[in-house]
């Protein structure tokens, strides 16, 4: 250092040297004489050594000191080259005799000087910080006062610092000896002696300082307590004071290090002057906000101070809440950094608050509130808070995953960022063997795979990574991961999941893992067998995003490297206002125009005015489309927004009453009501099963506002016409929905007039709709009340399509349809109509003919008779051509009569004249029964001409006798008495196989004669007579059936032989299985030993007992009897079914209809066309 530099710095450092010497040079001691003489001789050598000691002490300090302070400390001591700068004068040494015991040695003075220099340096730094803010001035003042208070503790540690300085001085001397090559032995000895003298002198003075009981210094109490304290305690106290001293200025140090403008001020000396700071900011230097210099010129000094506080690392956290609010209220410029930092802090608080409130029921509401705020700007904070919340509460992982799925469907970059951070977190935890972090992160990734946010490849990569190195922790993490997303992976890629389970099976068979982990693997296999029923991929209440609307990210473990942690920090935005406006427009498109509502409801009053564009506006836009060259958006974004808002409210509300109140707040226009009703119906149809919530909601809405009734009616009519466009699940949900509306009278029953149930218009989809619709109504109302409702006069016209009365074919179809769905009781009136319908046509024609005949005059009787005969002949010819059912029945009667005559030869041979007379009587009865159908001419001829009557009677008798005789002769020729028994047996077996034929064959002789006579006269009978004869014959068949049953029972009793029954019972008693177990075992043991059997007969004699076995012949006989019975039953059913022309399914329906509704039946099968009239 040059002398000029030292002289230039002398006046600047006068006050510091005076202040430092004021506390230390207050007295003198006796040990100073030897030091004087020593300094006179070897001043330069000693001071150069002291200079090195001081430099080492300064460099080893825990805090840093600038170069100026170091030079000031070393000014008194010369360098090694021997230049004596600022040496202490002899006069000053001689005059100052009143040194105290503590200030006799120069190293001690130097330590105090270093502390004082340190304090002065800190004060300079505090003065620099004082220019920034008043709060920094206060903190600097407090730290300065603390430093002055704690400087007293430096005197306590003097002894310890002296010892340190001695040891360092010795080391420096040795170093100088090694480096000095040119000096001889004398120089080394002088140095050694100097060091010894120095050590001795210092030890002497330390001892003398301890021996003194009283000192002249200001700090007596601290010196008195010195001997009682250990050096370790003193060191800890010093460290504590240093910590307290540094705590006050931590924030300022960080700000000095990290803020670029403040670094610039440190370099530039111009900023050290407090008066020129405001002027420089106006010029554009140190512009913290990064805005234009003109805007910064308008900022006041107070605003600048608040800006420095808010843009610091703490963000104003060290201020009181009132002061922070005042500062925030003063800032109104949105382009400033202070305003942006305040807005960012508010956004962070909102995000943390909403995420902490999430649960299963409130996911939709909270995501909607999150989307209102600018989450694109705060995406880093959002991802960080979600990951942190999931780590603290892993039980809500599926809820957070559902929320991320909703956000990812609208902002895929946020979902990708969160997934990347989770993957990086998992990789770091896997590398550090952190099991807890691995479990939480893998759990979250599994649920994101379930929600289709992450691809399945990522899950498979994680599983393979964990199972490749099978430790206890890795296998446990893999098991928990598989439990959560196993169902989804088996659905998507079952083969790869099967390979992973095979690897787990091999690990289990090796047996190297812990027993607990082995048991977990077994449990996992059991869960897989059960189909993951306790670990579903997605709960129904959290399935909020459709599969087509979701964006799936394909990430790999190796590709993800950078988590983008910079997004968590504040960053100034030059275009803050424009970006915020863009996001508001985007949120309106996503959430609808009610995104600004704070309560999450659907708006009310003025807010609902911007819900959708009015119909008039839309029309004007369409009209002006071709006139103006502007592009019109016809994608209907407002309509999509309305659908989204309604869907979110339906999923967020707890009950239908709350939902109805929220939906009614929208105050929709008339053109929007149809769309609103359609959205409700679509939401109901999309459910897996019908939910009563939608029916109750629509009923409440229709009662609150009756303008919604007409749109629902129109929708019902449209659905009835377009049922073929819907699948079965939607049809069932919609039909049950409208059934609920009709039951609650939310809409009128006049809607049913659009349904027409005919064979021509019948479609399977429409039949399914009507079936589920009517079955749901019957469940609500009951069959009795429902039938009563349908029979009211008001609904007579509306139900004409469902219950037609114009055509028998349509009547029959409606009856068959409702009976097939289990609602045949509704169609009683139609059944009665169907009975009357075929009889109405012939009866009217006959009545007209009768009236015409009665009105004719008596003179034209002959002509009318001839004309009537011709008419009858023509009618008979037409009947034969058309093959009426009456003629078929007559033919069957002929066939039946022939069979019965052949079966009863004996009775036919033994006929007497009495039988002939009885046949005449029967003929007369049949004629009397058919009087109504015979014409008036035939009746008059029979009544008023007895001769003709007798002649006709005799002729009829003769003809019948001749016929019977001819038939009897033929039967006697063909049939011998020897073959009678065999043929009768065959006939009995045939009768068993075909009981329907038997019932027709078993008729009395009187019936046979009457049937023959009716055949001869059937040409002259009408349909009404044949129907009456059928009714009479039906009654006779019932009596014949009861008679045949009795005969069968009697014959069965005769067939059974009593002796055979006794034999069978005896054999059963003697069988092996009825013998007691004890006797059986005893007999077997005796036979093994060779002894005779122990069984005895009735007289007490022993005899060998043979084990009886069942005879094969008896077993065969029973089997054959069982087969016969079974064959007879089946044959009778098949015969009846084949005769009726029904399939097997419809035969069962036929029997049911005969039991419940014995009126009509029509087969619905495509193959068979059969109509049955009872």
Swiss-Prot record:
Family of the protein in this entry: Belongs to the CWC22 family.
Function: Male determiner protein (M-factor) that controls male somatic sexual differentiation. Acts as a dominant factor that regulates the mRNA splicing of transformer (tra) and doublesex (dsx) transcripts and promotes expression of male splice forms of tra and dsx. Probably acts as a component of the spliceosome C complex required for mRNA splicing factor and exon-junction complex (EJC) assembly. Hinders eIF4AIII from non-specifically binding RNA and escorts it to the splicing machinery to promote EJC assembly on mature mRNAs.
Phenotype of null mutants: Complete sex reversal to fertile females because flies exclusively express the female splice variants of transformer (tra) and doublesex (dsx).
Transmembrane segments: none
GO cellular component, one term: catalytic step 2 spliceosome
This protein's encoding gene: Mdmd
Polar residues composition-biased segments: 36-47, 93-102
Subcellular location: Nucleus speckle
Main location per the UniProt record: nucleus
Biased composition (Basic residues): 167-180, 201-223, 869-909, 963-1001, 1034-1045, 1119-1130
Pfam families in the record: MA3
Alphabetical keyword list: Differentiation, mRNA processing, mRNA splicing, Nucleus, Sexual differentiation
Region listing for Disordered, in residue ranges: 1-51, 80-109, 136-259, 840-1045, 1096-1133
InterPro entries attached to this UniProt entry: ARM-type_fold, CWC22_splicing_factor, Initiation_fac_eIF4g_MI, MIF4G-like_typ-3
Protein name: Male determiner protein Mdmd(III)
Description of how the protein assembles with itself and partners: Component of the spliceosome C complex.
Compositional bias (Basic and acidic residues): 1-15, 80-92, 183-200, 235-259, 910-924, 1103-1118
MI domain mapped to chain residues: 641-757
GO molecular function terms listed in the Swiss-Prot or TrEMBL record: RNA binding
Low complexity bias (residue ranges): 16-35, 138-153, 840-857, 926-957, 1010-1020
């Amino acid at each position: 250092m040059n002398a000029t530099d030292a002289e230039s710095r002398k006046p600047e450092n006068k006050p510091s040297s005076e202040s430092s010497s004021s506390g230390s040079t207050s007295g003198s001691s006796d040990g100073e004489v030897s030091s004087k003489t020593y300094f006179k001789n070897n001043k330069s050598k000693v001071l150069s050594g002291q200079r090195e000691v001081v430099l080492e002490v300064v460099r080893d300090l825990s805090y840093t000191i600038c170069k100026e302070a170091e030079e000031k400390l070393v000014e008194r001591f010369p360098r090694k080259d021997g230049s004596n700068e600022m040496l202490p004068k002899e006069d000053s040494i001689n005059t100052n005799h009143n040194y105290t015991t503590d200030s006799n040695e120069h190293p001690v003075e130097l330590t105090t000087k270093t502390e004082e220099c340190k304090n002065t340096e800190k004060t300079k730094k505090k003065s620099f910080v004082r220019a920034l803010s008043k709060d920094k001035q206060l903190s600097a003042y407090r730290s300065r006062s603390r430093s002055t208070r704690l400087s007293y503790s430096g005197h306590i540690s003097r002894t310890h610092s002296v010892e340190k300085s001695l040891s360092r001085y010795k080391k420096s001397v040795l170093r100088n000896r090694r480096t000095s090559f040119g000096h001889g032995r004398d120089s080394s000895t002088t140095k050694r002696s100097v060091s010894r003298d120095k050590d001795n002198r210092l030890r002497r003075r330390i001892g003398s300082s301890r021996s003194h009981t009283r000192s002249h210094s200001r700090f007596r109490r601290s010196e008195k307590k010195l001997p009682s304290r250990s050096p370790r305690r003193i060191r800890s106290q010093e460290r504590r004071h240093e910590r307290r001293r540094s705590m006050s200025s931590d924030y300022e140090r960080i700000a000095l290090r990290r803020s670029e403008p403040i670094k610039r001020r440190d370099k530039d000396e111009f900023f050290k002057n407090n008066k020129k700071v405001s002027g420089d900011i106006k010029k554009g230097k140190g512009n913290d906000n990064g805005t234009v210099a003109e805007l910064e010129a308008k900022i006041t000094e107070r605003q600048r101070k608040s800006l420095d506080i808010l843009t610091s690392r703490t963000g104003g956290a060290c201020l009181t809440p009132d002061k922070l609010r005042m500062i925030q209220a003063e800032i109104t410029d949105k382009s400033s950094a202070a305003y942006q930092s305040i807005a960012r802090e508010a956004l962070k608080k909102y995000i943390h608050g909403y995420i902490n409130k999430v649960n299963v029921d409130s996911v939709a509401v909270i995501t909607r509130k999150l989307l209102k705020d600018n989450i694109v700007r705060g995406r880093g904070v959002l991802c960080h808070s979600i990951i942190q919340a999931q780590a603290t509460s892993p039980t809500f992982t599926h809820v957070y995953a559902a929320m991320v799925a909703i956000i990812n469907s609208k902002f895929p970059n946020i979902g990708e960022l969160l997934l990347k951070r989770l993957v990086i977190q998992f990789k770091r935890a896997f590398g550090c063997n952190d099991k807890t972090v691995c479990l939480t992160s893998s759990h979250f990734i599994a649920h994101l795979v379930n929600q289709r946010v992450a691809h399945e490849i990522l899950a498979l990569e994680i599983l393979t990574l964990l199972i490749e190195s099978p430790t206890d922790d890795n296998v446990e993490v893999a098991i928990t991961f598989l439990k959560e997303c196993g169902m989804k992976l088996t659905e998507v890629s079952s083969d790869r999941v099967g390979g992973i389970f095979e690897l787990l099976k091999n690990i289990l068979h090796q047996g190297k893992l812990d027993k607990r982990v082995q048991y977990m693997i077994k449990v996992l296999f059991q869960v897989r067998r059960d189909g993951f029923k306790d670990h579903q991929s997605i709960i129904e209440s959290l399935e909020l995003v459709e599969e087509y609307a979701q964006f799936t990210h394909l990430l790999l473990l190796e590709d993800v490297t950078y988590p983008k942690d910079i997004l968590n920090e504040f960053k100034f935005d030059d275009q803050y206002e424009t970006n915020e406006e863009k996001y508001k427009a985007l949120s309106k498109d996503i959430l609808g125009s009610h995104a600004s509502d704070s309560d999450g409801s659907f708006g009310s009053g003025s807010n609902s005015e911007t819900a959708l564009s009015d119909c008039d506006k839309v029309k004007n836009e369409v009209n002006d489309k071709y006139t103006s060259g502007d592009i019109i958006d016809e994608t209907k974004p407002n309509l999509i927004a309305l659908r989204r808002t309604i869907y979110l409210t339906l999923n967020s509300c707890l009950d239908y009453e709350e939902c109805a109140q929220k939906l009614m707040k929208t105050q929709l226009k008339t053109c929007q009501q149809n769309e609103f009703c359609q959205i409700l119906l679509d939401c109901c149809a999309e459910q897996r099963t019908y939910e009563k919530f939608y029916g109750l909601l629509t009923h409440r809405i229709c009662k609150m506002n009756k303008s919604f009734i007409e749109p629902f009616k129109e929708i019902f009519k449209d659905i009835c016409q377009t049922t073929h466009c819907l699948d079965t699940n939607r049809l069932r949900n919609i039909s049950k929905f409208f059934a609920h509306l009709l039951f609650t009278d939310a809409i009128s029953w006049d809607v049913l007039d659009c349904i027409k149930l005919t064979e021509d218009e019948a479609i399977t989809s429409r039949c399914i709709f009507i079936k589920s619709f009517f079955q749901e109504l019957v469940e609500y109302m009951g069959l009795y009340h429902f039938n009563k409702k349908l029979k009211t006069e008001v609904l007579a016209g509306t139900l004409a399509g469902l219950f037609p009365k114009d055509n028998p074919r349509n009547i029959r179809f409606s009856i068959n349809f409702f009976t097939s769905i289990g609602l045949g009781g509704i169609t009683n009136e139609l059944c009665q109509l169907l009975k009357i319908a075929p009889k109405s046509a012939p009866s009217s024609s006959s009545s007209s003919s009768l009236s015409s005949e009665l009105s004719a005059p008596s003179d034209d009787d002959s002509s009318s008779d001839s004309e009537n005969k011709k008419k009858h002949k023509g009618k008979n010819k037409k009947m034969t051509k058309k093959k009426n059912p009456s003629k078929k029945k007559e033919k069957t009667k002929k066939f039946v009569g022939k069979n019965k005559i052949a079966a009863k030869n004996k009775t036919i041979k033994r006929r007497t004249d009495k039988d002939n007379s009885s046949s005449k009587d029967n003929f007369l009865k049949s004629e009397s029964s058919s009087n109504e159908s015979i014409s008036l001419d035939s009746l008059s001829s029979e009544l008023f001409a007895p001769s003709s009557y007798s002649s006709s009677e005799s002729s009829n008798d003769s003809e019948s006798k001749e016929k019977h005789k001819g038939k009897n002769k033929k039967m006697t020729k063909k049939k011998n008495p020897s073959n009678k028994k065999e043929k009768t047996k065959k006939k009995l077996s045939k009768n068993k196989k075909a009981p329907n034929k038997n019932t027709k064959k078993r008729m009395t002789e009187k019936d046979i004669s009457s049937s023959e006579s009716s055949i001869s006269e059937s040409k002259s009978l009408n349909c009404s007579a044949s129907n009456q004869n059928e009714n009479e014959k039906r009654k006779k068949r019932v009596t014949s059936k009861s008679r045949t049953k009795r005969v069968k029972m009697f014959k069965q009793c005769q067939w059974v032989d009593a002796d055979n029954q006794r034999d069978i019972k005896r054999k059963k008693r003697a069988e092996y299985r009825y013998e007691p177990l004890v006797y059986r075992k005893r007999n077997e043991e005796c036979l093994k030993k060779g002894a005779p059997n122990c069984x005895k007969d009735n007289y007490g004699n022993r005899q060998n007992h043979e084990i009886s076995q069942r005879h094969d012949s008896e077993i065969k006989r029973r089997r054959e009897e069982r087969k016969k019975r079974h064959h007879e039953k089946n044959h009778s059913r098949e015969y009846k079914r084949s005769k009726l022309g029904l399939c097997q399914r419809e035969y069962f329906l036929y029997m049911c209809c005969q039991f419940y509704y014995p009126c009509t039946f029509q087969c619905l099968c495509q193959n068979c066309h059969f109509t049955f009239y009872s």
